[in-house]
Structure formats: C-alpha cells, structure tokens
C-alpha cells in the first residue's frame, strides 16, 4: 500500500459507520501500535484511533458529518501530509486542517498528527 492508499483507507474508515468495515480499513491503513496525536491529546494503538472516530468524528453534535481529503498527498520519503475538511450533511465545512503521517516501508501509518484549524 502506498502513502495515498493508506491515507484514503484512514479517511474511509473515519466515514464508515459499520464497525467491522472500519476495523478492517484501519488494519489496512495503520500499524497496530500507531501513535495518534489529535487536538484532544495523544493515543496509542488502532483502538485509540477508532475511539476518536466514533466519539469525535461520528459523534459530532452537528449530526452526520464526513472527513474529506482536500489536497493531494505530498509524500517526500517516509512522511506524508494532506489537507482535509470536516463537512456536514449540507456540504458546509465545519473544520479544516492538515495531517502529517509517518509511513513505514510496508506502507502502514505508524504515526499521525492532526493539525486542525487555521494558524494565527
């Protein structure tokens, strides 16, 4: 799996409500011991990413929302970055940002850092 495939599998996992499908996508995209940095803190393991998805991404008070990759994947070597938006059912952007991911030689994301919002 290349960088773009891993990132797109991660985004698809964030958007699916089927727990089994989400777990499969996360297993394809993320190393078992992935380190996940979000605005809410640091988590380790696929379970921490799954918890973030179900509680924060899918549990948003605005109702059903989805994560959309808004840029190409810039991948110099083992690092990748991409832009994203979090949009509601009407297509309005609620939040946007850039994520940076470290990708192993096997194509698994073993670290991901979420940068949400605009820089001052």
Question: Model features per residue range: what roles?
Answer:
Residues 56-120:
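A beta-strand edge to alpha-helix "cap/lid" segment located at domain peripheries
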Residues 1-29:
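Short acidic-aromatic low-complexity motifs
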Residues 23-76:
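A solvent-exposed, acidic/Ser-Thr-rich amphipathic alpha-helical stretch
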Residues 6-10, 52, 82:
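C-terminal ligand-sensing/allosteric alpha-helical core of TetR-family HTH transcriptional regulators
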Residues 8, 31-38, 83, 94:
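Generic, low-specificity signal for short hydrophobic/alpha-helical stretches with a mild N-terminal bias
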Residues 16, 39, 99:
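Short, flexible active-site loop motifs that bind/organize anionic cofactors or intermediates
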